[in-house]
Amino acid sequence: GMETAPGGNLKLTYGMPVIDPDVTKSRGEIFDTEANLTRIARDNVNRRSGKNMLAGKIQIILFSKEIAGQGRIYDINSIFERDPSDAILAWVVVVDGSPRSLIHQAEDNFTDKPRPSIYMNEILERAVATASTIETRIYNYDLISVAPGIDNITPLIKIADKSIEVKGSALFSKGKMVGTINAQENGLLTSMMKTLKHKKFTYNASLLPVADESYSEKQSAAIQLFQNSKKIKVSIRNNKPVVDIYLDFSGNADEYKWDNLNDEKEVKKFDEHFQEQIQQECQKLIEYMQKIGSDPIGIGDMVRAKNNDYFKKVDWHTTYKSAQITTHVKFHLIEYGDIQ
């Protein structure tokens, strides 16, 4: 875990499992230190630890929002790229709060959970599988950091009671964290960045208001989304990027009020309402990312590939904010269960 310290230094916290055949209950060893470099901090810990600490065994690196906001992650990561014994497959994760506090609480208070490193790895992998966050490892964080026209995105976690919750994702611009999105917004972003294929993404939809239906189960529906296709068209008009994002979804009604969904007219009405809802949320998400100057979709990279002369003439992050980006969504309900 890494967070800021006085004088521009780093507060580092290392959590390591204790492997002892005489100990029946799994436990960990935690070391807090402060240094100007991660390598120096590791040497400090090795002078105190009963076991030699090897960076190649690191599974997860937790950064505070302050460090992420200062744009320090890329430079801190340099040791993992330079030293072949270090782990470039470790997760890069931003913590809403103190990484030091999170590591200590996970070790001391999460008595009903697996070992902290295993627990965190499991919830991160599960969140990626449900499109609640994006998988980001050291190697692809560093690659995107040096690629023009695309910005990083990392998982965002937080302590919640006696557990850790994946809140969504942290968004970056020019190497600095500039915003966050929740788990549902991350699912929609995944459909525009990559694809929802092989993901189990459940969308929390709101239904058309009906008189005398005030309970939440009457006003909402859980729809499991499947992505059929994605297409992004990029062009330059009047010296401005024009981008059209086409998304085609189908879905299952996992949870829905008792209704006549076996009626084709009702299904069509549902399709149209839900299609418009997803389109509006995707458009709202695009506008938010433009406002904060974050381009995790890599629209700039597409402009660079197709209109390289134009890309070289402009400052992409400034141009991106005023680009005309429009989302187009199709949706069709394919399964809803037999309730009659």
Predicted regions and their residues:
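Membrane-proximal alpha-helical signals and transmembrane carboxylates
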Residues: G1-Q340
